[in-house]
């Protein structure tokens, strides 16, 4: 503010705030004397803008799942107001997903945020495609309201409505039989569910940058539950943490650790039996973010299919997810070779180690016991991300180290897009 005392601490806070937006590649703040006296200075801020909009696409290659295609259009600084908008789609042989979202993080002068999203998801499984054999068509809407409670703490509330249409395709499996029997529904016919969801999350963020942070930490705790007037009654809770430790003075070498845990279950009884987290809303593990080296949604408890003649189930190689998980990652960020000084702020290279487990605590309900949290997977690899003038481009090369029969491994994954 004009006429106020100069504070080096306040200058650093302002610089960090600008970096956290993710809108700028570099932020430099300098001071210079004003006029003939040396008791008045001017604070000057020089920034190099980063492209905040993107049109991107991605291709994943898996040993069993084949090609996965995704595309998105997003703008994180719409009209220069700091608002965020996106259109995202994801498609493979058995799933189609599309969503539209909009958030205004500066809805009021006190930084209260307001936003929402609409989504449509169609899952058409087929046991010949090595995915769980059922159909689930879902559409819904979510509205959120958030506000800061301090410089580094932020609270967000959300309200959602979701309609689902579910049925077995023909090959019965035990997880779906248990679910449909609980609600006295015929699994061979389409069943409709209407659920209202309430959510809450709290975030602490002391990272130095919004893109490619090199120091600080970030934690988020989230809870989502269906309301008592919904057709199903369950909750899901997650917690995640990120930590960045610079090794050298220039933050070219950075050690990073991150972790995530989750748990979900039912909270009421139906026909004398406690409800469960629906099998189609289970947690999943595998993919380019948390468990590299394994294809998306490819590890964890398996679908237990029913023999066509006898009244018994057998274990398949198809993952159906679980109601509890943990993941942990260690990364060592290193300078990228052959990159000019002018582009170093836009490129990040790292070697990584990923580990994680996905299990089901409701072992007494099923023929096979999947309740062991110690049945984990691990992988190692190299990751490269470039915020190029043509858009974000990332590569992951990974090797699954500890794996189990039926796991769908993915040695290579890349995403490419164009920015505006």
Language model features with spans:
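Hydrophobic alpha-helix-in-membranes signature
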Residues: 104, 245, 334, 388-391
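C-terminal soluble interaction/assembly domains
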Residues: 2-5, 368
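Gram-negative/organellar outer-membrane beta-barrel architecture
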Residues: 4-220, 255-257, 292-293, 297-310, ...
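C-terminal beta-signal and terminal closure region of outer-membrane beta-barrel proteins
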Residues: 282-288, 292, 362-420
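A structural signal for short secondary-structure junctions
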Residues: 36-38, 321-325, 341-346, 351, ...
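Short, electropositive, low-hydrophobicity segments enriched in small/polar residues
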Residues: 7, 84, 266, 326, ...
């Amino acid at each position: 503010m004009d006429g106020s005392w100069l504070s080096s601490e306040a200058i650093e806070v302002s610089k960090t705030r600008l970096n956290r937006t993710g809108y700028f590649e570099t932020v430099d703040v300098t001071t210079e004397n004003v006029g003939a006296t040396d008791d008045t200075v001017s604070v000057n801020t020089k920034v190099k803008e980063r492209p905040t909009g993107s049109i991107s696409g991605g291709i994943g290659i898996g040993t069993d799942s084949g090609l996965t295609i995704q595309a998105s259009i997003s703008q994180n600084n719409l009209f220069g107001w700091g608002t965020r908008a996106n259109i995202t789609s994801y498609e493979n042989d058995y799933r189609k997903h599309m969503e539209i979202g909009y958030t205004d993080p500066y809805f009021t002068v006190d930084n209260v945020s307001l936003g929402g999203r609409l989504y449509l998801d169609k899952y058409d499984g087929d046991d010949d495609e090595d995915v769980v054999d059922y159909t689930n068509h879902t559409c819904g809407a979510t509205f959120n309201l958030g506000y800061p409670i301090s410089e580094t703490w932020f609270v967000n509330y959300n309200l959602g409505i979701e309609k689902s249409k579910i049925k077995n395709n023909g090959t019965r499996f035990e997880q779906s039989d248990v679910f449909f029997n609980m609600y006295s529904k015929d699994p061979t016919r389409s069943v409709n569910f209407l659920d209202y969801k309430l959510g809450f999350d709290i975030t602490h963020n002391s990272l130095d940058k919004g893109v490619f942070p090199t120091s600080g930490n970030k934690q988020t705790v989230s809870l989502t539950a269906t309301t008592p007037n919904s057709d199903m009654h369950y909750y899901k809770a997650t917690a995640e943490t990120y930590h960045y430790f610079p090794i050298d003075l220039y933050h070219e070498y950075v050690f990073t650790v991150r972790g995530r845990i989750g748990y979900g279950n039912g909270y009421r009884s139906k026909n004398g039996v406690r409800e469960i987290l629906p099998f189609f809303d289970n947690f999943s593990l595998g993919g380019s973010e948390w468990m590299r080296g394994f294809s998306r949604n490819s590890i964890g408890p398996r679908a237990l299919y029913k023999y066509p003649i006898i009244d018994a189930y057998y274990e398949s190689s198809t993952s159906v997810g679980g109601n509890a998980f943990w993941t942990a990652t260690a990364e060592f960020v290193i300078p990228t070779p052959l990159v000019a000084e002018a582009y170093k702020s836009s490129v990040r290279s790292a070697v990584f180690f990923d580990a994680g487990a996905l299990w089901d605590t409701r072992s007494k309900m099923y023929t096979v016991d999947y309740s062991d949290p110690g049945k984990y997977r691990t992988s190692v690899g190299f990751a490269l991300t470039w915020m190029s003038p043509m858009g974000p481009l990332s590569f992951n090369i990974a090797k699954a180290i500890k794996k189990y029969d039926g796991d769908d491994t993915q040695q290579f994954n890349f995403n490419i897009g164009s920015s505006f």
